[in-house]
Amino acid sequence: MKIGIIGAMEEEVTLLRDKIENRQTITIGGSEIYTGQLHGVDVALLKSGIGKVAAATGATLLLERCQPDVIINTGSAGGLAPTLKVGDIVVSDEARYHDADVTAFGYEYGQLPGCPAGFKADDKLVAAAEDCIKALDLNAVRGLIVSGDAFINGSVALAKIRHNFPQAIAVEMEATAIAHVCHNFKVPFVVVRAISDVADQQSHLSFEEFLAVAARQSTLMVENLVQNLARG
């Protein structure tokens, strides 16, 4: 099995990258892909860059160049579920765009023409992630993760997301684009991120302060998930 791992920022991939053995680097299309073994498992780690276009471009290159069997999207997210605090884990059962609107033509809010309203995460990957959460005794929430090309730190933007997606547990800037590409390539995916802020008016300050905490927690989860998947 080869596992693809995608993070947007240097801070979100550096801890994992440093643990990859026999590491080789592919630089292409504004992305960097690091291949090798993580705990003896073949992996391809992508640093995509921030935002939906960067994430989709990188995910496509990763799938074409490295042909992983599954994709794990890692990194940080803004918490929406009331029980979440900094360092907690969110696991996707679905990903949707919060900034797509073609409702004038009868589509659901967040749905693009020719696409499902949401992109479903793979049940087996979700179950494996929840096994790791239980083993590590982490606080976590599973549910809908929404994505858009905006860092959410104001009451108006937050209220709009809560209105359109009251069930959403977290918000970030890449996951749904990655899920969209995985859907097109028919490759299973799951989003496993750690909370860096709670998407409020102080979220930009919280993000800067707690990104390192989120990176450590998401790295811990991904390492355990990789080993869990390799064991089958």
Swiss-Prot record:
GO biological process, one term: L-methionine salvage from S-adenosylmethionine
UniProt-listed Enzyme Commission number(s): 3.2.2.9
Catalytic activity: S-adenosyl-L-homocysteine + H2O = S-(5-deoxy-D-ribos-5-yl)-L-homocysteine + adenine; S-methyl-5'-thioadenosine + H2O = 5-(methylsulfanyl)-D-ribose + adenine; 5'-deoxyadenosine + H2O = 5-deoxy-D-ribose + adenine
Active site: E12, D197
Enzyme type, top EC level: hydrolase
Keywords annotated in UniProt: Amino-acid biosynthesis, Hydrolase, Methionine biosynthesis
Subunit (UniProt): Homodimer.
One MF annotation (Gene Ontology) recorded for this entry: methylthioadenosine nucleosidase activity
Natural source organism: Klebsiella pneumoniae (strain 342)
Amino-acid biosynthesis is among the record's keywords: yes
One Gene Ontology CC term in the entry: cytosol
PANTHER family registered for this protein in UniProt: 5'-METHYLTHIOADENOSINE/S-ADENOSYLHOMOCYSTEINE NUCLEOSIDASE, 5'-METHYLTHIOADENOSINE_S-ADENOSYLHOMOCYSTEINE NUCLEOSIDASE
Residues noted as binding substrate in the record, renumbered to the chain: G78, I152, M173, E174
Pathway connected to this protein: Amino-acid biosynthesis; L-methionine biosynthesis via salvage pathway; S-methyl-5-thio-alpha-D-ribose 1-phosphate from S-methyl-5'-thioadenosine (hydrolase route): step 1/2
Purpose of the protein: Catalyzes the irreversible cleavage of the glycosidic bond in both 5'-methylthioadenosine (MTA) and S-adenosylhomocysteine (SAH/AdoHcy) to adenine and the corresponding thioribose, 5'-methylthioribose and S-ribosylhomocysteine, respectively. Also cleaves 5'-deoxyadenosine, a toxic by-product of radical S-adenosylmethionine (SAM) enzymes, into 5-deoxyribose and adenine. Thus, is required for in vivo function of the radical SAM enzymes biotin synthase and lipoic acid synthase, that are inhibited by 5'-deoxyadenosine accumulation.
Pfam short name (any one): PNP_UDP_1
Family: Belongs to the PNP/UDP phosphorylase family. MtnN subfamily.
Record's keyword annotation contains Hydrolase: yes
Gene name tied to this protein: mtnN
Protein name from the UniProt record: 5'-methylthioadenosine/S-adenosylhomocysteine nucleosidase
